[in-house]
């Protein structure tokens, strides 16, 4: 019996191979990583105190995603790594403006990543797609990536906002989400990770077809009585998938231990969860 697996929530800049990061740092003379002996431990950051602290490592990975060649390789290796884990369908997200420079346009960034994915598909059969991310702590960034997503919607599979969730609720970007929905760009919105149920509700109100993380929907459920609050009811009745990322939640200290994670409660309640 073959088990077909999918990954719906993965950040391209969060999964560089340690050896590749070291090699690219040397090639590009990226000094912050040149003297790091154990890059894998440096990136794992399992002792992070918060989501914001955890995200600091992304500064270094995105710095290496500065050329067509690097992006293409990183995308290929990401899809290859997924294939080696038994994944047949892979959706990866990335904030393209991190890579735009004098020699790379937004289209170049998208094309480079898709080229890497296509190479992996040709070699292994894995199907991969790109979700563009705007950074929610930078309003102008979200506006620009919205335009990019609309202009190149045939080359991508969706749009998201990433970055620190607290204090940057989805409602701040209602105009952008409206434009994306009007142009038939699929929305999955980070919510219910760094902030609570209100953030999830705002994501739904703005057209999200999936919720990135969404684990804090558990706060809208009375586990003793089995009663759902309005947001949990909407997700349950409309079969809105939650992109649960258990190890990420542990690394960012949302939960101190795997046994404390509410994934089993959500599964037992028949919520539409995916594990990433």
Where does each model-flagged region fall?
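Metal-cofactor-binding active-site regions of metalloenzymes
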Residues: 1-185, 194-205, 210, 216-276
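Conserved hydrophobic beta-strand within the GNAT/NAT acetyltransferase core sheet
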Residues: 187-189
């Amino acid at each position: 019996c073959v088990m077909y697996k999918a990954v719906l929530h993965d950040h391209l800049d969060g999964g560089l191979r340690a050896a590749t990061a070291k090699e690219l740092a040397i090639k590009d003379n990226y000094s912050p990583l040149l003297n790091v002996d154990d890059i894998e431990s440096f990136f794992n950051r399992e002792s992070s105190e918060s989501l914001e602290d955890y995200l600091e490592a992304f500064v270094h990975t995105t710095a290496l995603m500065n050329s067509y060649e690097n992006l293409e390789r990183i995308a290929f290796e990401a899809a290859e790594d997924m294939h080696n884990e038994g994944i047949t369908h892979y959706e990866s997200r990335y904030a393209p403006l991190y890579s735009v420079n004098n020699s790379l346009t937004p289209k170049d960034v998208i094309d480079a990543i898709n080229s890497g994915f296509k190479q992996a598909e040709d070699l292994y059969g894995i199907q991969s797609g790109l979700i563009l991310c705007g950074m929610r702590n930078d309003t102008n960034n979200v506006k620009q990536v919205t335009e990019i997503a609309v202009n190149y919607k045939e080359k991508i599979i969706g749009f998201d906002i990433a970055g620190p969730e607290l204090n940057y609720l989805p409602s701040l970007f209602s105009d952008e989400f409206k434009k994306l929905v009007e142009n038939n760009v699929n929305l999955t919105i980070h919510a219910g990770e760094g902030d609570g149920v209100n953030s999830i509700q705002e994501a739904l109100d703005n057209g999200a077809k999936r919720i990135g993380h969404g684990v804090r929907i558990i706060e809208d459920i009375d586990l003793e009585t089995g009663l759902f609050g309005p947001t949990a009811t909407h997700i349950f009745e409309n079969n809105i998938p939650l992109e649960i990322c258990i190890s990420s939640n542990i690394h960012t200290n949302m939960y101190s231990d795997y046994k404390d994670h509410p994934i089993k409660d959500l599964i037992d309640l028949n919520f539409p969860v995916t594990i990433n």
